[in-house]
Amino acid sequence: MDRPKPFSVQQLADTLCIPLVDILLPCRFCQRFLTYIELVSLNRKGLQLIWTEEDFVFACCSSCAFATAQFEFSNFYEQSVCSWEIEIVEQKPVGDIIIRCKFCLKKLDLIEKLDICYKEEQFHKVRRNWKGLCRHCRAIE
């Protein structure tokens, strides 16, 4: 029976019994190797590794994640809702809704979601997924 493939960079490092700093992962889109900071960021953002049928593993670098987010927002935008309205649309609490940053694709934590609701900002539905603004991208916007 095949061993399950790791979904995160940390799981990959643990599976291979090597330190995270020694992981060399190419970006699926630009083929550049991710830096150590990008590897750590990939874990923090909750992004998964990309596996091919031939068992090659790839990731997505920060530049390509940003470009992908912009492309999807421009081409697959569906709707926007104001703060708490997302709970009405989804029929569940905002804490239970998966929302990613519209710029860096980080999975938003509860504080970031509540901050958007408190400030009465908008959530955007893009390609059947909700987007908001993470604290890091908010600080540099």
From Swiss-Prot:
MF term (GO), any: zinc ion binding
Q: What is its main location?
A: host cell
Residue ranges annotated as zinc fingers (unnamed) are: 27-64, 101-137
SUPFAM superfamilies per the UniProt record, alphabetical: E6 C-terminal domain-like
Species this chain originates from: Human papillomavirus 15
Lineage, please? Answer: Viruses, Monodnaviria, Shotokuvirae, Cossaviricota, Papovaviricetes
Instruction: State the gene name recorded for this protein.
Output: E6
Subcellular compartments: Host cytoplasm; Host nucleus
Q: Of which family is this protein a member?
A: Belongs to the papillomaviridae E6 protein family.
Q: Name one GO biological process term.
A: symbiont-mediated suppression of host innate immune response
Q: How is the quaternary structure described? A: Forms homodimers. Interacts with ubiquitin-protein ligase UBE3A/E6-AP; this interaction stimulates UBE3A ubiquitin activity. Interacts with host BAK1.
HAMAP family in the record, alphabetically? Answer: HPV_E6
Its annotated function is as follows: Plays a major role in the induction and maintenance of cellular transformation. E6 associates with host UBE3A/E6-AP ubiquitin-protein ligase and modulates its activity. Protects host keratinocytes from apoptosis by mediating the degradation of host BAK1. May also inhibit host immune response.
Q: Which GO terms describe its cellular component?
A: host cell cytoplasm; host cell nucleus
Q: Name one Pfam family in it.
A: E6
InterPro entries, alphabetically? E6, E6_sf
Protein name (record): Protein E6
Keyword field: Activator, DNA-binding, Early protein, Host cytoplasm, Host nucleus, Host-virus interaction, Inhibition of host innate immune response by virus, Metal-binding, Modulation of host cell apoptosis by virus, Transcription, Transcription regulation, Viral immunoevasion, Zinc, Zinc-finger
